Amino acid sequence: GKNLNTFSFDFVNNHKYFKSNAFQPSEDRPWVDKMVDHAKTDHRYLECDNENMIENLYKAVDARDLPCMADVESSMLYFCSKVVKYNKVTLTGECADEIFGGYPWFHKEECFKAEIFPWSMDMQPRKMLLNDDIIQKVDLESYARTAYQKTINETPKLYGEDRIEARRRQISYLNLRWFMVTLMDRMDRTSMHCGLEARV
């Protein structure tokens, strides 16, 4: 039989500058090494530098059809362009955090209890991107609260669930209906722009 091709993505000198944070508490590389050792795959460690990201910024906008998450999408586009040289179809780890509760809002108490989208608890950074005229015409907080409450109301309920488990289900549903949709669209558009069929 043939060994499975696997790929991991990292940034040049990440090992030198990595700082633990809520979204990425540890580097990926040690875990990748364990997976490769266990599964005996034909693994390629792909790295991206600043020049690669800059070169792919406009391509990332083209792939998405609108301005996007800048370095996140340009680096993904770069990595997809490398993977497609070996495989035309690939399985990704995209959406694993939504399914398995990998985000900080599944665990941090203030996020878990917040009655708003846990990834948008502070709207100020988003409002800074908008013109003052738009901010006056559009009540972002009200829109977010309404969309949040509508999604909470449609969250499936399980008989006999305690309050904590019911809230965990709500957080999961918010992720599936909102956060994950953004990531799936990004993955689909970025990979297909490179001719790579990515499955989540």
Please provide the spans of the model-predicted regions.
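PAPS-dependent sulfotransferase catalytic domain
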Residues: Y173-D185
